[in-house]
């Protein structure tokens, strides 16, 4: 099967669970694949315990659909009698062992297992073609597995398969731009790109969309097959019936035989015939959404993630202080919980609570060093020495440090300033406040964050900008708790006043940004990278209070200092630990204070600013 990665236009006939747990129905599907002229049939081999936890809402369904090892042997032998190659979806150790026993020709890892690093590595070492589903994946997840495999030279037979299924799957749930973009990003690693089409089988587009994907560079097309759509066997929604599948195979083979990277419209006309060509032209002329730029995760991708993604669970009882290994972790669907945490980020971490067999593994059950990193320097284009300006007798940076030190969930507070002598005073203040100090790059703020985190061995970073001195430490503690439970790449506080937002993220996230930013200088605008869910999984925490949207609690101008002076004069002398919520209530009754600086402009990114990542 090595030629599969060198020949564009291969079709994989996906039987999925269309057999409904009946070996005889599966044989009929195999007959249909053979009749169509496709060369590869794919089976979904699994036992229920590989897919879901006991008691999961789909537990009984998977039991009804699962075939035995002997039945898979029978089905595979039958397919080979029909001169078909056999691929198998792998969902865990059991299905991998069965597939190896069957000596299948290739594997696929479903997108639900994309975070199961060890399983993918183990399957890849069999040195067979390996399709990896990446539908509904954040790019950081794809980048994580490809770079992991690349380090051990296992990318050469990898084919990434974009495509999602949401029952029914609308046309605009697919992105052909995704195919081109994945080729650009991951072909340098040696990986190829395919396309898993899930358009409703009763739509003419079900024939045409894969043809366009081929012209975009897809090597393989995966397409669901059924006998007769009217019978409505399981998984029929995205499937073509027997006769239509044969027609589809004929289209693809004729286009592929032209040996043209980009077929012309006259090529399509000669292959499709007059009537189908008219439908094809209409599709192309009305498919602009399929070629839209990739900027954020679509609602369909988010829906797909909720339906399919597995979470890490304990393979056995884990005591306190246990250092995790791959043997301690399995991935299963868990009702109501979606932990987007790859297994290679769990390895080596120690448990801080007991974790029972089958219990979800999340950061809050593991040792994590969490540091609040305050970024500050004295030189500023808009307000020089703003960190040293005094409000009620104390430097603004001192007020900020005092508030952050009240956070109960932080293991340490670090002032990350520059190596420029002008910032010596900031280092002295940090030492007086008994917090840690890191001095680094003058202009590369993201690098300063990263190097400070590495110096003090942080697992998780709380991003704190030095000109936002009225942080809500209570909300910040709540956000840290949420971050450790949800295990997203990034947790942000939102619906807070200007100057009160925080981001919490793992140290490896900022490393990805630094190494892969298209324009390195733009990493200064770190929040725009962090909160792009095309790249990273995001979790949000909101306060339970309201506020006047004109309130501005950041420092960029002298008017900001003047406004904050009024706030501190009202609260600080009677209660130095005053809460942000009390400030917001007071400002509601004193709008004249808000007016002091409400007309000052907040520094938003220019719409032309390039904050893309090469992942």
Name every feature range the model reports, one short phrase each.
Residues 239, 271, 312, 323, ...:
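Short aromatic/basic micro-patch
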Residues 471-552, 559-566, 582-615:
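Conserved core of the sugar-phosphate nucleotidyltransferase
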């Amino acid at each position: 099967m090595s030629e599969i990665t060198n020949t564009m236009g291969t079709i994989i006939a996906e039987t999925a669970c269309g057999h409904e747990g009946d070996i005889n129905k599966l044989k009929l599907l195999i007959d249909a694949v053979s009749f169509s002229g496709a060369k590869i049939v794919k089976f979904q081999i699994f036992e229920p315990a590989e897919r879901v936890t006991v008691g999961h809402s789909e537990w009984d369904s998977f039991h009804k659909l699962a075939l035995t090892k002997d039945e898979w042997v029978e089905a595979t032998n039958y397919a080979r009698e029909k001169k078909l190659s056999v691929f198998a979806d792998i969902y865990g150790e059991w299905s991998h062992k069965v597939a190896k026993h069957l000596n299948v020709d290739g594997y696929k890892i479903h997108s639900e297992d994309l975070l199961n690093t060890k399983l993918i590595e183990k399957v890849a070492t069999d040195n067979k073609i390996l399709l990896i589903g990446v539908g509904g994946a954040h790019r950081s997840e794809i980048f994580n597995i490809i770079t992991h495999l690349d380090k051990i030279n296992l990318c050469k037979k990898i084919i990434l398969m974009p495509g999602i299924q949401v029952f029914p799957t609308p046309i605009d749930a697919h992105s052909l731009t995704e195919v081109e973009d994945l080729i650009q990003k991951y072909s340098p690693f040696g990986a190829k790109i395919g396309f898993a089409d899930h358009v409703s089988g009763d739509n003419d587009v079900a024939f045409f969309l894969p043809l366009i994907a081929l012209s975009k560079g897809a090597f393989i097309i995966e397409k669901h097959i059924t006998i007769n759509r009217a019978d409505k066997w399981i998984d029929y929604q995205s499937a073509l019936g027997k006769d239509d599948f044969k027609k589809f195979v004929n289209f693809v083979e004729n286009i592929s035989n032209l040996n043209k990277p980009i077929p012309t419209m006259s090529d399509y006309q000669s292959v499709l015939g007059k009537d189908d060509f008219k439908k094809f032209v209409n599709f192309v002329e009305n498919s602009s959404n399929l070629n839209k730029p990739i900027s954020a995760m679509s609602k369909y991708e988010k829906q797909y993630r909720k339906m399919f993604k597995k979470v890490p669970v304990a393979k056995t009882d884990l005591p306190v202080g246990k250092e995790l290994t791959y043997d301690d972790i399995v991935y299963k669907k868990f009702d109501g919980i979606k932990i987007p945490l790859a297994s290679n980020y769990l390895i080596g971490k120690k448990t801080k609570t007991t974790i029972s067999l089958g219990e979800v593994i999340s950061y809050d059950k593991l040792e994590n060093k969490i540091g609040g990193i305050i970024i500050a320097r004295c030189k500023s284009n808009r307000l020089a020495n703003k960190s040293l300006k005094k409000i009620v007798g104390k430097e603004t940076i001192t007020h900020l440090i005092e508030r952050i030190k009240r956070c109960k969930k932080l293991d340490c507070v670090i002032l990350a300033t520059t190596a420029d002598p002008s910032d010596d005073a900031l280092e002295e203040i940090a030492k007086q406040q008994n917090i840690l100090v890191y001095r680094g790059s003058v202009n590369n703020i993201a690098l300063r964050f990263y190097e400070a985190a590495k110096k003090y061995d942080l697992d998780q970073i709380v991003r704190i900008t030095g000109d936002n001195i009225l942080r809500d430490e209570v909300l910040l503690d709540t956000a840290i708790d949420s971050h450790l439970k949800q295990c997203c790449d990034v947790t942000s506080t939102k619906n807070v006043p200007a100057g009160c937002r925080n981001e919490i993220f793992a140290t490896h996230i900022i490393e990805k940004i630094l190494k892969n930013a298209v324009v390195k200088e733009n990493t200064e605008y770190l929040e725009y990278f962090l909160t792009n869910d095309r790249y990273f999984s995001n979790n949000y925490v909101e306060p339970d209070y309201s506020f006047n949207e004109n309130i501005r609690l950041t420092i960029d101008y002298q008017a900001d200092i003047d406004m904050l002076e009024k706030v501190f004069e009202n609260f600080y002398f009677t209660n130095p630990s005053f809460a942000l919520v009390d400030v917001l209530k007071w400002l509601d009754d004193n709008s004249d204070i808000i007016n002091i600086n409400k007309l000052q402009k907040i520094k938003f990114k220019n719409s032309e600013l390039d904050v893309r990542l090469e992942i």
